[in-house]
A protein has these predicted regions:
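Hydrophobic alpha-helical segments, especially transmembrane helices
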Residues: 9-10, 27, 42, 86, ...
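A short alpha-helix capping/helix-coil boundary motif
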Residues: 31-34, 61-66, 90-95, 115-118, ...
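Hydrophobic faces of well-ordered beta-strands that scaffold small-molecule active sites
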Residues: 36-41, 65-67, 95-100, 125-127, ...
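Active-site beta-loop-alpha junctions enriched in small/polar residues
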Residues: 41-45, 68-72, 100-103, 130, ...
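A conditional alpha-helix N-cap/helix-loop micro-motif detector
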Residues: 46, 77, 106-107, 130, ...
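Glycine-rich, proline-tolerant flexible connector loops at the mouths of alpha/beta enzymes
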Residues: 66-83
Length: 277
């Protein structure tokens, strides 16, 4: 064998080994899949009948939906609940949360809502609880092992700032926490990533929503086109350990009669951010 051939073989072997090592390094450095599942608050699709709304959710490539009461009313009709669960199963969808629901000091009415949630497979109830409802809720979240997540609604709402939510829940059962509507927190002048960090350990739902201005009266926009730093939000959610079965829902309230193109943009932005987190 000539010296040149031997040298070439030695070079090729070394190159192959180097390539193999590089490939292994890339595999080792690859990020594990994020424990976050993107879904949609079906209020975004309120302009459609429920079957069509679910079809749109599936077409958007989503696998979980958050119902609002207008599309899945609270009921003790077992057949109606089974029928809705079948609609979801037929489309490969699961239900992440239900809300926004009000709780009062009427313990029987609160129990009815929890019984509905249990039958429907709801793990998180997004809620606007009256202050005198918490004694009842402490008992119900233990009995049913279902979370209650306070939903903020902006500057005129009783749960305006993140500290308002935290103050309401911190002395109660750990399963009582927050559904942070990041758009409404923007309207309240709060930065979404700071809200997420403040609510760490009590954060069970997120509404991915964006507004043009950090003020009460403003316009909803495509995710990332206002004050919502979507990649930073995803990174913050991972950092605080947002639960794998939490409700991470896109909510887009503009153009209810024809929102699909806008929702496609929102989904693309959110997915890209998830891939970067």
């Amino acid at each position: 064998m000539s010296q040149s051939v031997a040298s070439r073989r030695t070079f090729l072997a070394a190159s192959a080994a180097a390539c193999g090592s590089a490939a292994l390094a890339r595999v080792a450095a690859a990020k594990p899949p994020l424990p976050l599942t993107l879904g949609i608050q079906l209020y975004s699709l309120r302009g459609f009948p429920v079957d069509q709304a679910l079809d749109h959710a599936k077409a958007l490539g989503l696998t979980q939906v958050e119902f609002y009461p207008g599309m899945f009313p609270i009921t003790d009709d077992a057949a109606a609940i089974v029928a809705m669960k079948q609609k979801l199963a037929d489309r490969g969808l699961t239900i992440s949360a239900h809300g926004v629901n009000r709780f009062t000091n009427d313990a029987a009415a609160n129990r009815k809502l929890f019984a509905f949630a249990k039958a429907a497979g709801v793990k998180t109830i997004a809620a606007d609880p009256d202050p005198d409802s918490f004694a009842s809720l402490d008992e119900l979240v233990k009995e049913f092992d279902i979370r209650v997540a306070i939903h903020n609604h902006g500057p005129t709402h009783r749960y305006n700032k993140a500290l308002d939510v935290l103050g309401a829940v911190e002395k109660h059962d750990q399963r009582i926490g927050a559904c942070a509507d990041l758009g409404h927190f923007i309207r309240s002048g709060e930065r979404p990533t700071e809200v997420i960090r403040l609510l760490e350990g009590r954060l069970y739902g997120i509404h991915l929503k964006d507004f043009a201005e950090m003020q009460d009266k403003t316009k909803g926009v495509i995710l990332g086109q206002g004050h919502l730093d979507v990649p930073a939000v995803m990174e913050a959610l991972v950092a605080v350990g947002f639960p794998a079965d939490g409700a991470l829902s896109i909510e887009y309230e503009e153009n209810p009669k024809d929102p699909i193109a806008d929702l496609e943009e929102c989904v693309a932005v959110a997915r890209q951010a998830l891939n970067q987190a």
